A protein has these predicted regions:
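Adenosine-nucleotide cofactor-binding segment
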Residues: 168-224, 281
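Glycine-rich phosphate-binding loop and adjacent beta-alpha segment
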Residues: 223-289, 324-328
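Short, glycine/polar-rich helix-capping loops at beta-to-alpha or helix-loop-helix junctions
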Residues: 98, 179-186, 247-253
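Glycine-rich NAD(P) Rossmann-fold beta1-alpha1 loop
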Residues: 128-129, 154-161, 221
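NAD(P)H dinucleotide-binding glycine-rich loop of Rossmann-like/cofactor-binding domains
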Residues: 86-151
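Glycine-rich beta-strand-centered segment in the early N-terminal region that forms part
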Residues: 23-39, 50-90
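Residue-level marker of beta-strand positions
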Residues: 64, 81-82, 101, 149, ...
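C-terminal hydrophobic helical "lid"/dimerization subdomain
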Residues: 274-328
């Protein structure tokens, strides 16, 4: 079978499509025929060697994939069953989805919900799954459509744009924050009530500003997150899942101790299985068919290295899917 294999030579990461034997696959109780995978930012860092993502070589990248069970030694899965996988260190320290087959632990897999195709699952991918977890965090924090307006930062990205669509589908009034004015019309099509320029949130202000938002999903971090915290309603919840703008948090405790604001971290990598299943079930039912018509490009395994480099150079728009095996 074919796989994109990363090897290291003289400190450089080399990526090429190789033929490997099924016996070379890592340990696991379920073998999956991979239909679709994707090129995420973390994949791009791994494939190009620009980030210290991979510490053990050789490695097959691909942090998410969707496909069909080929063989199972676990009672929860049967041959022919469609499945999806995100996270768990797959594609980082366990061979991932950029191969015609993947062998993984059964408790890492989620049965593909009815109504969702493998291709649609990978249009959503890790970003869509993370967005759903963020929405669930707001709900668990008591934020409802009646609570008031909610805001999403980094709305042009995969997590942010999906969060806008999900919140709109659930009846929330959504404001999107974006640094790309050319995406404003697209964000409004997804359901954003208004789109604000990221620059409005990039400068430090007072410890407490006028209360504007009942809830927030932040994918940016740093000053944008700090500014949002100063603008939250009393008792509001902020779900933070990203660091596109940096890892710092130049904030004060004032929003927490005077406005009872809750800052909820959201991690998608180690999310327990039951919560994963609930998130994917809701993703399959909430989003309209038009969501899956968004800008995507489909590539082959051989095109993955060049595409990874282009993604890091901001030359890629939309989601990149890798057609690995049989496609729907």
């Amino acid at each position: 079978m074919r796989a994109l294999v990363l090897r290291q030579q003289d400190g450089l990461t080399l990526a090429d499509v190789s033929t490997i034997e099924p016996s070379q696959l890592p340990d696991g109780d379920v073998t999956v025929d991979v239909d679709w995978s994707g090129i995420n930012y973390k994949d791009a860092l791994a494939i190009t060697g620009k980030g210290k993502i991979i510490r053990q070589f050789p490695m097959v990248p691909g942090i998410d994939f969707a496909g069909t069970v080929h063989h199972s030694d676990h009672p929860d899965f049967q041959a022919g069953q469609p499945v999806v996988l995100t996270g768990w260190g797959v594609g980082e320290n366990h061979w991932g989805g950029l191969a015609e087959q993947a062998r993984v632990r059964a408790d890492w897999l989620v049965p593909l919900p009815q109504g969702l195709t493998p291709r649609q699952a990978m249009i959503l991918g890790t970003a869509g799954f993370t967005a759903m977890l963020c929405v669930m965090a707001l709900e668990e924090g008591g934020v409802t459509p009646a609570s008031g307006e909610v805001v999403v930062s980094g709305a042009s990205g995969g997590v942010g744009s999906t969060a806008v669509a999900l919140l709109h589908a659930l009846g929330y009034q959504v404001t999107a924050i974006s640094g790309r004015a050319d995406n404003n019309a697209y964000l409004q099509q997804l359901g954003a009530h208004q789109v604000l320029d990221r620059k409005e949130f990039a400068t430090a202000g007072r410890p407490l500003e006028k209360q504007r938002w009942a809830g927030a999903i932040d994918t940016v971090g740093d000053q944008v997150l700090a500014t949002l915290l100063t603008q939250m309603h009393y008792g509001a919840t902020v779900a933070a899942c990203g660091l596109a703008g940096g890892v710092s948090l130049p904030a004060t405790v004032m929003p927490f101790i005077l406005r009872n604001v809750r800052l909820q971290g959201v991690d998608s990598v180690m999310t327990p299985r039951a919560r994963r299943q609930e998130a994917w079930r809701r993703l399959a039912t909430l989003l309209p068919a038009s969501f899956y018509e968004q800008v995507t490009q489909e590539i082959t395994l051989e095109q993955a290295p060049a595409t990874a480099a282009a993604l890091l150079e901001n030359r890629i728009t939309g989601r990149t899917l890798v057609r690995v095996g049989a496609a729907d």
